[in-house]
Amino acid sequence: MHLSDLAHPNELHGLSVAELQDVAKQIRERHLEVVSNSGGHLGPGLGVVELTLALYQTLDLDKDRVVWDVGHQAYPHKLITGRYADFDSLRQQGGVAGYLKRCESEFDHFGAGHASTSISAALGMAMARDRQGLDYKCVAVIGDGALTGGMALEAINHAGHMPNTPLLVVLNDNDMSISPPVGALSSHLNRMRLSPPMQFLSGSVEESMRHLPFMGGDLPPELNRLKESMRRLAVPKVGAVFEELGFTYMGPIDGHDMGEMIRTFQAAHRIGGPALVHVITKKGKGYPYAEADQVGYHAQSAFDLGTGKARPSKTPKPPSYSKVFGQTLVKICEQNSKVVGITAAMATGTGLDLLQKALPDQYVDVGIAEQHAVTLAAGMACDGLRPVVAIYSTFLQRAFDQMIHDVGIQNLPVTFVLDRAGIVGADGPTHQGQYDISYLRAIPNFTVMAPKDEAELQRMLVSSLQHSGPCAIRIPRGPGEGVPLMEEGWEPLPIGRGEVLRDGDDLLIVAYGAMNSKALATADLLASCGVQSTVVNARFLRPLDDELLHPLARRIGKVVTIEEGTLAGGFGSALTESLLDADIKPSILRLGIPDVLVDHATPQQSFEKLGLTPAQMAESIQGFLQRSKLTTATSVVQQPSVSVLES
């Protein structure tokens, strides 16, 4: 069977193991071809090709449900569920998404992008099935990294107390998440995987059985049962954790042995309650470069298949905000042993891998456990340390209660660096960092700031570590502005003070964070039309620089706010409320992300769709200025890409 001819995953039923192995080869070839050209997640999908095919041999995908945790390992799933022909459009605007989306395919049973949700969702589906008297299988596929997340363990705890609810959890154990997983559970899985009896059974015994004179290639059912019995006798603690929690445990089994997985999944489906099949896979399987560097090839930009090296950028780029943050934090930690960097399984993405290498004693990786990371930092701050928590904006949403309850209310000196704040591009709506402005400004005692460039980031980091309360700094994905950087001696910023970047009498533009460069470009375009703008870099969301902004707004009378975040409750709302509370009522135009989900595309395409390029903003502002001349009545106007408040 050729993969391009596969119209439905059920067409895989009845194929021999040899035929399935040929399909697996085609999946890897297509996977590598597309990701090498367009970029995307590489290692996770390559590692689960056989697992996917074996599992789907035992399911009826017209009715059975499969929930893939996170979804970045589901490229093989997409290739056998009707998206082969469109796969070249992976992660491109209007094309195949990099994660699972219910609106994209009937076979994407649950959307995802964040880790540790699959078991809860699959259990919910199983309970809905049983309550309605229906008959279908529910399966969650979760990695060993995601299993460290508290939500996954909560779901296992719940499911284990429902002995009559059939649910299959497939543990994809590749000893990795994005980076190597951490914690006691991960160590336990590693001991199971590498124990001498397990290695002996997985290798020597099976190989000896295969070479018995009356044996062919695959072991018959009788010897498979003998092998499983020997496995349990030799390693009595295998799976004890899961069995104590109410699951029937099966494994560990070879995640690249199609026949063994099919037999095991078939047996697991016959269990009348929760079952867990522990599958050992190799991340990056089938591509030597990805197997050798499982962190580096977790996700890749476009690269050369022959060499495995990234294709060189057409133009050199400044260092990323993440890298500047990591380098600066290392310098600070070298001077202050009380500063500690904390990440939730995202060391490389946040720049904390630099601290991990330079000063491992001042670095903590808690695994996929954002809630724990925040309260751990709070505890450290209570007893004299200065923790710096670096987490993606979208993932910090998971710890909102801890930020309020454990940090904000107690006014503890914890610094949060929110990476990937704003538009992130090809990862789509689950990863856009568009909500942090709105949720951070509501938390008591927090100081919230965003730098206009990477040099200002350095100063904000120093300022936060000298401040007596909690601070949050949002930084965007990608390269900085290319401004000169200092190696040390950074001057702290006065808390709550913005700066004027440009003077003009016709319009006040107040920009927050990385949108300052676009604000200045917009002001240049307006100046060519005769509109002179004062441009202010707000720097701080909380507290706002009322001392600077109120007189300017009162004098100029026309205000535009620009932010890379959701307008509802955002920076523009904060400034509008501050002005109205002071009985200052200028005409106000808020530019930012309206009440929409921002789909996968390049950042530039997303900005264009949202009307947030300098040319588009200049056009919106010209319309706003024209309307301001025609009315003095208070009104609210909504546009596709802007929200307008006029008075």
From Swiss-Prot:
This protein's pathway: Metabolic intermediate biosynthesis; 1-deoxy-D-xylulose 5-phosphate biosynthesis; 1-deoxy-D-xylulose 5-phosphate from D-glyceraldehyde 3-phosphate and pyruvate: step 1/1
Record's keyword annotation contains Metal-binding: yes
Catalytic activity field: D-glyceraldehyde 3-phosphate + pyruvate + H(+) = 1-deoxy-D-xylulose 5-phosphate + CO2
PROSITE patterns: TRANSKETOLASE_1 (PS00801), TRANSKETOLASE_2 (PS00802)
One cellular component (GO) term of this entry: cytosol
CC cofactor: Mg(2+); thiamine diphosphate
Chain positions recorded as Mg(2+) binding sites: D144, N174
GO biological process, alphabetically ordered: 1-deoxy-D-xylulose 5-phosphate biosynthetic process; isopentenyl diphosphate biosynthetic process, methylerythritol 4-phosphate pathway; terpenoid biosynthetic process; thiamine biosynthetic process
Entries under Gene3D superfamilies matching the protein: 3.40.50.920, 3.40.50.970
Record-linked SUPFAM superfamilies: Thiamin diphosphate-binding fold (THDP-binding), TK C-terminal domain-like
Record's keyword terms, sorted: Isoprene biosynthesis, Magnesium, Metal-binding, Thiamine biosynthesis, Thiamine pyrophosphate, Transferase
EC number: 2.2.1.7
UniProt GO MF annotations: 1-deoxy-D-xylulose-5-phosphate synthase activity; magnesium ion binding; thiamine pyrophosphate binding
Pfam families (alphabetical): DXP_synthase_N, Transket_pyr, Transketolase_C
Residues given in the record as thiamine diphosphate binding sites: H72, G113, H114, A115, G145, A146, N174, Y287, E370
Top-level taxonomic group: Bacteria
Note on cofactor: Binds 1 Mg(2+) ion per subunit.
Keyword match Glycosyltransferase: no
InterPro entries in the record: Dxylulose-5-P_synthase, THDP-binding, Transketo_C/PFOR_II, Transketolase-like_Pyr-bd, Transketolase_BS, Transketolase_C, Transketolase_CS
Function noted in UniProt: Catalyzes the acyloin condensation reaction between C atoms 2 and 3 of pyruvate and glyceraldehyde 3-phosphate to yield 1-deoxy-D-xylulose-5-phosphate (DXP).
Protein family (similarity comment): Belongs to the transketolase family. DXPS subfamily.
Subunit structure of this chain's protein: Homodimer.
Protein name (record): 1-deoxy-D-xylulose-5-phosphate synthase
Species, as recorded: Synechococcus sp. (strain WH7803)
Lineage: Bacteria, Bacillati, Cyanobacteriota, Cyanophyceae, Synechococcales
